[in-house]
Amino acid sequence: MAPPNGTANDVTTTNGSYTNIVGRKTTMHKLIEEHGSILMPGVQDALSAAVVEKTGFHAAFASGYSVSAAMLGLPDFGLLTTTEVVEATRRITAAAPNLCIIVDGDTGGGGPLNVQRFIRELISAGAKGVFLEDQVWPKKCGHMRGKAVVPAEEHALKIAAAREAIGDSDFFLVARTDARAPHGLEEGIRRANMYREAGADATFVEAPADIGELKEVSSKTKGLRIANMIEGGKTPLHTPEEFKELGFHLIAHSLTAVYATARALVNIMKILKEKGTTRDDLDQMATFSEFNELISLESWYEAESKFKSFTPKAES
């Protein structure tokens, strides 16, 4: 498939295939090359990852906002630790082994050496990539107010450190900048290109305000580009086909799953509280058999059947 509009020459070969900044193809590069643009739902835990995989998606995003909500019941306010992120990643990748899992790494856990340790732990946990952002710690969700960013050169060093830690691993490095809100779009674009030069496989200018800003990001940034669709957020919602035409390659729906889960739980709990039973509202839930299929219950019965009895060999 030919590269979509806006792809920079420095990430394509002469036949239109994708490589990373050091000339290797990661799983994510191959997916983008095959499909042109990749729709990547957010996941918050092992169950949501299993749903995404069984629905037929190729990739998923372990969103910090979503993981913080599911694991801690807390907002995306810099409260989630890197240790907790790695723990959540292990569970997510185990539940969805065929998904390309990209992890929200927030600011990377400290300085360049902390970033390197974090990257190695994510690789060990089965992740296929990470987003690293340039916010001041403690960070906030990219669509919340009150954000600040570190000097661009400071984050570029983290990206360079991450690139070194990745080595030959199948791991996709995304550099995110939140500079649009505090300093304007031009600064966000400048930073994205600097982070690309430092070693990022793709760049992500968070929270463009409209189609005009999306077009400007596409025309002025190099390499592969990420867009983030937040229902109720600052960037208007667009389809993957529309983003492909705009020159974006990876489209994250970071919070769709956690928002849908929250709404469904609130609704059914209200029903249970008001009625004292769910007898007349079973259509609001998965059935017993549907859920067992979702969590692959039968495969566990099959595994269990191998160990029903043991017969020792007769002595000669």
Task: List the predicted regions and their residue ranges.
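Alpha/beta enzyme core
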Residues: 17-253, 259-263, 267-270, 306-316
